Amino acid sequence: MGWMLAMLSIWFGGAPAAARAVEDVRVSDDRIVVRFDDPVGAAAAFLLGGPDRIAVDIDGAVPGGRRSTGGPVAGVRLGARGADGARIVFDLAEPAVVTGGRFSDHGRKLTINLRRVDPDRFLRATTAGRMRFSTGLVAAASVPVSSSAAMIVDRRATVSVPVPARRGGIALPRVQGDADRPLVVIDAGHGGHDPGAISPHSGAREKDLTLKAARAMRDALLDGGRVRVALTRDRDEFLVLQERYAIARRLGASLFISVHCDSAENPNATGASIYTLSEVASDREAARLAARENKADILAGVDLGKQSADISSILIDLTQRETMNASAGFARLLGREAQGQVPLKPNYHRMASLMVLKAPDLPSILFETGYISNEADAERLESAEGRRAIAQSVRRAVEVYFARRMAAR
């Protein structure tokens, strides 16, 4: 009987030896650094008011180790979240928000970037939800099967875990416009439980701004009367990356535009950019963005969007040169039409291996409309006037694009 109780204890309580321990927590003027004795797979940060605090939940970890304060942080407290992991609470001496973060050292180090703000901005940011960080590596044995914690499994591990069933075929959205016109599908990035990037200035969420921008683009295009338009989502819902371009292909779209807001640790980073597909990133920032956006599906608790290297190669092989050239041509048109209307980065046309652009026969771009982490860009993205300028730029570019294609036939 004793051995059965021991086995039940391990099964329902998790194996203590598999948990990662928090070794050290250090705070400086503009960042928090948390170190672990073994790799950690995921964490999430969020803000709490009355009193002002930053909370960080770490999946599969146990509290412990050294801690120090500094900068805006007056105190550090660690505790357990049952079988789900550890929580670190940072008591603030002055308001500060989380502007970004990342894992390094193979999951053994988490760096969270901080920025001081005024009390009103902190209060607004408390409504923004969680900012999530992931390494893509976690030992499955560290989290009990019954746990509600999201699990991201190392692809090299030889373990079996239960995953949510795939959703059935998603309903196709409404198409608006005259039936004889070419179809443009506009994809508002993120949505549902995935907020995307969050403004440290206003607490605005990327998922809300992209939906407003997509609706403005739709309305501008319909007013022009030259194309039909459909939105992949017209409400706050989550779509996996393949569903987004699959909707466009099933509808027979002639052009796909995915709308996003960029974010960077540097608060001075500013300007819109336009991405087209390439397996080789055009620069380091393009590679960073691809890594961030391609992980969007992981937020559902399992990486439904992950493809093997072989499948990824097949997709690229299938992508016709004509399609990639058409995408690049539209990107240049959009940049031209946005000049003087929407602030652009000097090298606004970039290339990256973005999953949402991998439809093999559909010209596609990802439009980063500005930096939500930059105060001026965020104000523009949140304003009706700013969205109108973006939408009119898209309308002009779309109309020229299809006029040229008609003339070339």
In which residue ranges do the predicted regions lie?
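Bacterial N-terminal signal peptides
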Residues: 2-13
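Catalytic-core regions of hydrolytic enzymes
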Residues: 151-311, 320-332, 388, 392
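Surface-exposed patches in mature extracellular/periplasmic domains of secreted proteins
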Residues: 43-45, 100, 227-235, 259-260, ...
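Active-site-adjacent mobile loop/cap segments within catalytic or ligand-binding domains
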Residues: 265, 315-409
